[in-house]
Amino acid sequence: MPEEESIDIKFRLYDGSDIGPFRYSAASTVDFLKQRVVSDWPKGKTVVPKGINEVKLISSGKILENNKTVGQCKTPFGDIAGGVIVMHVVVQPSLAKSKTEKKVDKAPKAVICTCTIL
């Protein structure tokens, strides 16, 4: 039985701090990585994801899809044997809240026009 490839990954946060590195199998999904990032999120950060849907992982300039595996996301030309892959973490709050907040803000405003003839 062949040994499954394992990949070392660390996650770079918005402020330059890192989570990891951790070792994952090439068959691990991006969804699994996001769960790990949310569960290991450092205490005291100003931006904290509420769930995996608010987390985006970026590797080699591409946003990774949840159903892809680590092996599928790995770029062949950028890897150094024994090196650690750095994935950038972006927290993007869900849009549903911000859309409803905008509607509430616009509702009480009224347009008032006046004309003055001199």
From Swiss-Prot:
What are the UniProt keywords, alphabetically? Cell membrane, Lipoprotein, Membrane, Methylation, Palmitate, Prenylation
Where does the UniProt annotation locate this protein? Answer: Cell membrane
Lipidation sites, kind S-palmitoyl cysteine, are 113
Q: Any keyword Metal-binding?
A: no
Q: Which residues form the propeptide?
A: 116-118
State the InterPro entries in the record.
Answer: MUB, Ubiquitin-like_dom, Ubiquitin-like_domsf, UBL3-like, UBL3-like_ubiquitin_dom
What PROSITE patterns would the database entry show?
UBIQUITIN_2
Tissues where the protein occurs = Ubiquitous, but three fold higher expression in senescing leaves.
Q: Where are the Cysteine methyl ester modifications?
A: 115
Coiled coil location: none
Q: What does this protein do?
A: May serve as docking site to facilitate the association of other proteins to the plasma membrane.
Q: Recite the other comments.
A: Heat stable and remains soluble at temperatures exceeding 90 degrees Celsius.
Name of the protein? Membrane-anchored ubiquitin-fold protein 3
Gene behind the chain? MUB3
